[in-house]
From Swiss-Prot:
Gene of this entry: cwlJ
Pfam families in alphabetical order: Hydrolase_2
Subcellular compartments: Secreted
Alphabetical keyword list: Cell wall biogenesis/degradation, Germination, Hydrolase, Secreted, Sporulation
Protein name per Swiss-Prot or TrEMBL: Cell wall hydrolase CwlJ
Amino acid sequence: MAVIRTTSRDIDLLARLMRAEAEGEGDLGMLMAGNVMVNRVRVGCLDFADINTVERMVFQSPGGFEATQKGYFYQRAREKERRLAQRIVNGERTHPAEFSLWFFRPDGPCPEQWYGQWNSGRYKAHCFFNPTSADCPEVYGVF
């Protein structure tokens, strides 16, 4: 069962963004990036209170994803990436990104906190950050 409402176009957008942000991290890295992306759509907290569609999440400004500013994002999604995106929409979650709303790629080690949000772990080059349950309880809810 889908955890957010999507169209075929949404799956394509999500797949392209997952690839553009995390292709170098392999399938698991793209799935983790996708966890963050879908979490931003499904919660109504912090910087994502008005982000209730995949398209709004993908093109959020300010505070969105840098990959949308690069040409690689605008290349057509491959079927493999579309399947990964559908798995995320269907509710697949992977630690350390299952409750994350942010990730980034630092030059060195992951900081313990990033803009007041706690580090939940690292996968290859990306560090993932979770909101506190006081700031965003719905990200921790069952769906």
